[in-house]
Amino acid sequence: MSKVKNIAVVAHDNCKKELLDFVDCNHNILSRHNLVATGTTGGLVEKMIMERVEQKADEGYEFKPVNRMKSGPLGGDQQLGAMISEGKIDVLIFFWDPMQPQPHDVDVKALLRLAVLYNIPTASNRSTAEFLISSPFFEGEFQRKETDFSSYTQRKL
C-alpha cells in the first residue's frame, strides 16, 4: 500500500454529520489522499474539503475531487465493494447506523464482508476512524497481508 491511499468514505444519513465533523477535523490529512464515496456522502465531503483547501490555499493545499459512486441504496455500496475486490481501495471509513434498518442492508453487509475478506482496514465509528488516521501506517508505506484464495478458485466441482 503506497503512501497515498485510496480511501472510501460512507455514512448513513444519521451518521453524516459525525463523518463530516471527522473530515473537517482531519481535512489536512485526508486532502493528501484520494477519496472515493457513495453519492450523497461524496458531495458533502467534497464540499467540506474544498472549503478547507480554499481557506488554506496559501499553505500549499491542493484540492482533489472526490470520486463519487452512486448513492448507497442505488448501488454505490456494491460499486465500492467491487473496487475493494479489484484492489482499488486501501481504507474503508463507513459510519453506519446500528439503530436504523436500511433498505439496502444486504448491500451494506456485502461491502463489509468484502472489506474483511480482502483485509482492508475498516473504521465503522469515530473512535476507530481516529485510531486509523493517527496510525503511522496511514501516511506511510504498509504491506497489507493478502489472503491466498487459490484453494477456493482452483477447487474441483
Curated annotation (Swiss-Prot):
Gene3D superfamilies: Methylglyoxal synthase-like domain. Pfam families: MGS. It catalyses: dihydroxyacetone phosphate = methylglyoxal + phosphate. Substrate binds at H12, K16, T38, G39, T40, T41, S71, G72, H104. The gene is mgsA. Belongs to the methylglyoxal synthase family. One of its GO terms (molecular function) is methylglyoxal synthase activity. It comes from the Bacteria. Residues 1-157 form the MGS-like domain. Catalyzes the formation of methylglyoxal from dihydroxyacetone phosphate. This is Methylglyoxal synthase.
